[in-house]
């Protein structure tokens, strides 16, 4: 794409279409599993995900997600709010790029690393080196929990570390949730699980969004450790050499 147009990651990831206001693509959507991964009272949940019936600021309008005028096209019945609300269509300097949404660019930049990620990386190293319950790891994780308005009672277990990375860094281009699961050895099991979506409908009598029973949907995800444990070597790396062999399966 044209790099001077500004960040496109956010626009690519809001639900497909934009109610005739701006055309997004819906490439990445939160699952019900991610929604449920947040503890009760975790302020990051509503800052990360827009759930049916919630309001988002979009193209200068306050939109009730899933209402009669603003239906939901997302495969999971939800969409990402993080870095998106309020949505302002332009490049990173505020200049309009293309009002029909073909470029889906946003005034917001894309975070490549945050201080919270640094704290989580150190906590992970301490837990994996010294064992669960490490005192310094508890302090680091409690800093993350405090910011999310959660009790500062971290057990500093591997399970909590993994979940904190999932919740804190959801929908961030780097670090990648996929790469986390690969290096932990969790990717094959995670991708084999069915994906659940949130179902909802607009009740015209009540004039509100009503949440229905969730359902599974086929997301087409697979993970073969023999192939997907690593990425393919870029084609350009083979230029001028006969000593490289492409990774298996690519």
What are these regions (language model features)?
Residues 32-114:
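Flexible, polar/acidic helix-loop-strand segments at domain edges
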Residues 42-50, 109-144, 158-168:
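Extended, hydrophobic/aromatic-rich amphipathic alpha-helical segments that build helical scaffolds
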Residues 58, 129-131, 136-138, 150, ...:
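A generic "cationic amphipathic patch" detector
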Residues 39, 72, 121, 177, ...:
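Exposed, low-complexity/repetitive linear segments and helix-based recognition motifs
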Residues 24-25, 35-38, 134, 151, ...:
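Generic detection of long, well-ordered alpha-helical segments
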Residues 1-21, 102-105, 109-110, 145, ...:
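Long, intrinsically disordered, low-complexity segments
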Residues 8, 13-24, 29-49:
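An acidic, gly/pro-interrupted, aromatic-rich
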Residues 55-56, 133-134, 178, 188:
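Flexible loop/turn segments at secondary-structure boundaries
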């Amino acid at each position: 794409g044209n790099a001077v147009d500004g960040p496109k990651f956010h626009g690519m990831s809001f639900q497909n279409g934009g109610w005739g206001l701006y055309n997004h693509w819906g490439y990445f959507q939160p699952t019900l599993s991610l929604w449920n991964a947040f503890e009760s009272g975790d302020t990051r949940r509503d800052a990360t995900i827009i759930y049916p019936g919630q309001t988002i600021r979009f193209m200068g309008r306050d939109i009730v997600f899933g209402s009669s005028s603003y239906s939901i096209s997302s495969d999971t019945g939800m969409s990402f709010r993080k870095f998106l609300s309020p949505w302002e269509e332009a490049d990173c300097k505020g200049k309009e790029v293309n009002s029909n949404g073909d470029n889906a660019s946003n005034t917001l930049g894309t975070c490549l690393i945050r201080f919270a990620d640094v704290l989580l990386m150190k906590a992970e190293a301490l837990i994996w080196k010294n064992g669960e319950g490490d005192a310094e790891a508890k302090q680091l994780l409690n800093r993350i929990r405090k910011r999310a308005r959660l009790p500062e009672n971290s057990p500093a277990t591997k399970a909590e570390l993994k979940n904190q990375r999932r919740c804190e860094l959801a929908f961030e281009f780097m670090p990648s949730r996929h790469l986390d699961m690969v290096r932990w050895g969790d990717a094959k099991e995670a991708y084999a699980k069915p994906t659940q979506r949130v179902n909802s409908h607009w009740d015209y009598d009540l004039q509100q969004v009503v949440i229905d029973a969730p359902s599974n949907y086929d997301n087409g995800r697979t993970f073969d450790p023999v192939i997907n444990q690593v990425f393919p070597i870029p084609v350009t790396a083979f230029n001028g050499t006969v000593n490289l062999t492409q990774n298996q399966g690519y």
